[in-house]
Amino acid sequence: MTAYFAFFAIMHSILADPRFKTWAGKRFGNVFDRWQRLAYTVLALIMILPFIYIFVSLPDRILYIVSWPGMGLTAACQALAAIALLAALRQTGITYFLGLEQIKRASAPGGLVTSGFYCHHRNPLFFFAALFLWLSPIMTLNLLAFNILATVYFYIGALHEEQSLMAEFGPEYEAYKKRVPMFLPRLKC
């Protein structure tokens, strides 16, 4: 599981790297600019399928099951994390995130989002995804391994993403970084 996850993470990171995008953009031009994000998203979904198969077919054992009423509380918090994740995704722009907006025009408008969840922390998508994973009321050995790997990947992915945002937005993003924490949300904007 760890080896395939590492392969997925490395491929996902290479394809998201600004240097790769610049290289491929020069090589393939406007076609790449329009289709890159959608291809990236579809490839990620395809690459996750073998991981899911590996995950469910490995021997596993339960580490804990949260008893009632704690199970209800953790499940409710998990649902809230999922709702917040979807709201942050909507705020980012779902069609832009998926790559559908870029198909219409190669340089889809995308300004730096600093309001809403992004006013409280710079990486709400990673934060809420990690929160959703760790709030599972049932923890197995495989799920624990996955949660650790995913959390490490979210952190590395956030660092990678911040390099891209620095390259794209420069001083505006630098100022944003100085006033807004990376993961742990601040209460006031």
Which residues make up each language-model segment?
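Hydrophobic transmembrane alpha-helices
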Residues: M1-M11, S107-C189
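A generic, lipid-embedded transmembrane alpha helix
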Residues: A39-F55
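Non-cytosolic membrane-interface motifs at loop->transmembrane helix junctions
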Residues: I62-L73
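Transmembrane alpha-helical segments that form the membrane-embedded catalytic/substrate-channel core
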Residues: Y4-P18, P50, I54, Q78-L100, ...
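Juxtamembrane "helix exit" motif at the C-terminal ends of alpha-helical transmembrane segments
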Residues: P50-L63, S136-M139
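Juxtamembrane helix-capping/reentrant segments at transmembrane boundaries
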Residues: A24-L43, W68, I103-T114
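Membrane-interface loop-to-helix entry segments
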Residues: A39-T41, G72-A82, S115-F128
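Short, Lys/Arg-enriched, Gly/Pro-containing loop segments at transmembrane-helix junctions
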Residues: T22, Y64, T95-Q102, M166-P171
